[in-house]
Amino acid sequence: MYHIIINPVGGKGESQKALQTVKKLLDAKKVPYIVHETQHAHHATEIARELSREPDTKIIAMGGDGSFHEVLCGIENFENVTLGLIACGSGNDFIKKSGHPKDVEKALDVILKGNVGYVDYMDLGTTRCLNVAGGGMDVDVLVKYASVKKLKGSAAYNYALIYTLLHTRFHKLRLIVDGKTMDKSVFMIGIGNGGFIGGGLPICPHAEVSDGKLDVVIVNEMKKRRIPSMLLKFLKGKHVEDKTVEEFRTDRVIIEALDDSRFELDGEIIEDRYLDIKVVPNKLKMFM
């Protein structure tokens, strides 16, 4: 039995199209399944929590990084659960590093073949993160995007991006790594299990989802006239070669906002201004 968890209105209608494809294929193969449609924010977490209490539970999470995040946060007993991913959300960044197919039929085929592997995730005490925890410019864009009322979809996001770049600011953060405290003024920071954000921006290009490490990339304050060229480097994952950028691996990092900066986990803005992030290596069992 497969338990499908899906946001029925997610992905600008793509979730429903993908669900119909999956149901048709499963019905043709006479594979038993139950569809759990989420009704409100964090409902996927509640559903996953209940399902994970039963042994040999096969969960198919359908959606984007936010949906995968919610399902991960709900798992109580990792030994009971094997998780399959079908990406059909507005942001599908985790699969760019995990190797899961983007095509719905191919992703389902991976699940039905039954081959499993284990991936890392990030533990923050009260929550978890599968892909990237971030701060700085990308969060400023998300905050502005959430406030745009007259535009929708990509038009709203592009407006938020342009607005943020025209009003660039740097963020005062404190990091503690391996007992060393560092106060930074940053343009952007990414702490990655996966490596991509924003639908394809490789902020942590060297991250691997099963290496037992967090990849930390810090883009430090720079002259504002350099920002356009830095963004071009971002598109190719070449920003880590720039002298203003620091990149290192660790198994734990503490990050604290020293100003009004906010953070995001898997593309979702959070209110916490102090994050204690630890990698949990090879814990999450997935169809791969």
Question: How would you label these PLM feature ranges?
Answer:
Residues M1-I59, C73, K180:
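ATP/NTP phosphate-donor binding region
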Residues P8, M62-G64, I86-C88, N193:
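Glycine-rich beta-strand-to-loop/alpha-helix junction loops that act as flexible
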Residues S15, V177, D183, E208, ...:
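ATP/nucleoside-binding phosphotransfer catalytic cores, i.e., glycine-rich phosphate-binding loops
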Residues K29, N77-F187:
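Catalytic core of DAGKc-family lipid kinases
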Residues S67-E79:
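Short Gly/Thr/Asp-enriched flexible loops that form oxyanion-binding sites at enzyme active sites
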Residues G134, D138, G190-I203, I269:
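Glycine-rich phosphate/pyrophosphate-binding beta-alpha loops
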Residues K149-A156, P205-R225:
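Gly/Ser/Thr-rich active-site loops/lids in small-molecule metabolic enzymes
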